[in-house]
Amino acid sequence: AFIGDSRTDGFMIYSGIGNGKNLTSNGLSIFKLKEKKALTIDGKKYTLLEALALEQYGKVYLSLGVNELGYNNDKGFYEKYRDAIQTIRQLQPNAVIYIQGLIPLNEGVIAQTGGSRYLTNEHLRVYNDLMRKAAQEEGVVFLDLYSEFADGNDELPAEASKDGVHLRGAWCRQWL
């Protein structure tokens, strides 16, 4: 199962992964994970975690953090991530839990397309460090996607995204 925001949704659509439950919501943040009723299943609204509880999975991937960059609440982000990991563990006791680190941004493309100024790799790296720390403390796997996607300028290559945030289809396949 994959829990995340629009970046994870794009991955699920364009990567060709083929299987895996898509539990995503555009604009979702770790701060709203337990509150936002984002999925409709058989006519009933669920939070992503409520939907996760409907089935058992061998692996659960969590990737949230870009939408939170403008919150200026690093401590709250870290605490909510730990809480999310603990909740997922309760809901999926037999699953291996993976925290997917945030893929870098391309700040030049973000500026050209009128994106938000709070979207910076500097703050994104802080969030990755907090996610890594939460994963280590909770005994789950942290996947360093930043290093996999960063170019020689330590950012997402311009050709990888038309808005500097969301990956193009071919780059989603690289995520696999």
Show the residue positions of the predicted features.
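Conserved SGNH/GDSL esterase-like catalytic core that processes O-acyl groups on lipids
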Residues: 1-80
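Second-shell loop/turn segments in exported
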Residues: 35-38, 67-76, 88, 116-121, ...
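N-terminal cationic-hydrophobic initiation segments that often serve targeting/anchoring roles
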Residues: 52, 88-90
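Alpha/beta-hydrolase-fold catalytic nucleophile elbow
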Residues: 63, 100-101
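Generic structural signal for well-ordered alpha-helices
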Residues: 81-85, 128
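A short helix->loop->beta-strand "cap" motif at the edges of active sites that frequently abuts
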Residues: 92-96
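Catalytic His-Asp segment of secreted/periplasmic serine-dependent ester chemistry enzymes
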Residues: 105-176
